[in-house]
Amino acid sequence: MRLILLGPPGAGKGTQAQILVEKLHIPQLSTGDMLRAAVKAETEIGKKAKAVMDAGELVSDAIVNAIVAERIDQPDCANGFILDGYPRTLAQADAVEAMLGERGLKLDAVIELVVDDKALVGRIMKRAEDAQAAGQPVRRDDNPEVFEERLREYYKKTAPLVGYYYAKGLLKGVDGMASIDEVTRQIEGILAKA
């Protein structure tokens, strides 16, 4: 099972990815984690990424795509994987299709967690309040201004992927405002038909 989880920040992609990892026994692939692992392992592409990050620049699509391609060749991805936070752009979506095609693979599903923006802001504020109450640090991106900027960035760059995957017949939406268990049930129903 090879799938992508789409949705704005705070929609619950990470939460659902962790649940699916347990249920499907396939890894969650996060580009941030993959970049850090490639840098730590000092792979050729990891060295390139480190040089860019050390210079304080954003890692290019070419480097991110190469790291994803390297990662999906690992044995634990043989039965599939969950892409969370990637692809973020149409160019990256094209790269995913190309890298899978080169391996004779395809995506099984693209699941969009559909949420209400106002409710998302409330969800993020609650997450920050809960962290403070528990004496835990508040995530930098749980600040309303930072979050709203991330939301704008999502709609500008990532939201076009919804149309891209819809046109390919891969996109399925779930009610991301439902309870965690209900969202999981909806996703499982989609995957059973994939």
From Swiss-Prot:
Binding site for ATP: 10-15, 127, 178
GO terms under cellular component: cytoplasm
Region annotated NMP, chain positions: 30-59
Residues reported in the UniProt entry to bind AMP: 31, 36, 57-59, 85-88, 92, 139, 150
Region (LID): 126-142
Family matches, as Gene3D superfamilies: P-loop containing nucleotide triphosphate hydrolases
Gene Ontology MF terms: adenylate kinase activity; ATP binding
Broad class of where this protein is predominantly found: cytoplasm
Record InterPro entries: Adenyl_kin_sub, Adenylat/UMP-CMP_kin, Adenylat_kinase_CS, P-loop_NTPase
CDD domains membership: ADK (cd01428)
Catalytic reaction equation(s): AMP + ATP = 2 ADP
EC number: 2.7.4.3
Pathway: Purine metabolism; AMP biosynthesis via salvage pathway; AMP from ADP: step 1/1
Protein localization: Cytoplasm
Gene Ontology annotations of biological process type: AMP salvage
Keyword terms of this UniProt record: ATP-binding, Cytoplasm, Kinase, Nucleotide biosynthesis, Nucleotide-binding, Transferase
Keyword presence, Ribonucleoprotein: no
The keyword Ubl conjugation belongs to this UniProt entry's keyword annotation: no
PANTHER family from the UniProt entry: NUCLEOTIDE KINASE
Function statement: Catalyzes the reversible transfer of the terminal phosphate group between ATP and AMP. Plays an important role in cellular energy homeostasis and in adenine nucleotide metabolism.
UniProt record similarity statement: Belongs to the adenylate kinase family.
Subunit structure: Monomer.
Domain remark from Swiss-Prot or TrEMBL: Consists of three domains, a large central CORE domain and two small peripheral domains, NMPbind and LID, which undergo movements during catalysis. The LID domain closes over the site of phosphoryl transfer upon ATP binding. Assembling and dissambling the active center during each catalytic cycle provides an effective means to prevent ATP hydrolysis.
HAMAP family assigned to the protein according to its UniProt record, in alphabetical order: Adenylate_kinase_Adk
Name of the protein this chain belongs to: Adenylate kinase
Organism this protein belongs to: Chelativorans sp. (strain BNC1)
Taxonomic lineage of the native organism: Bacteria, Pseudomonadati, Pseudomonadota, Alphaproteobacteria, Hyphomicrobiales
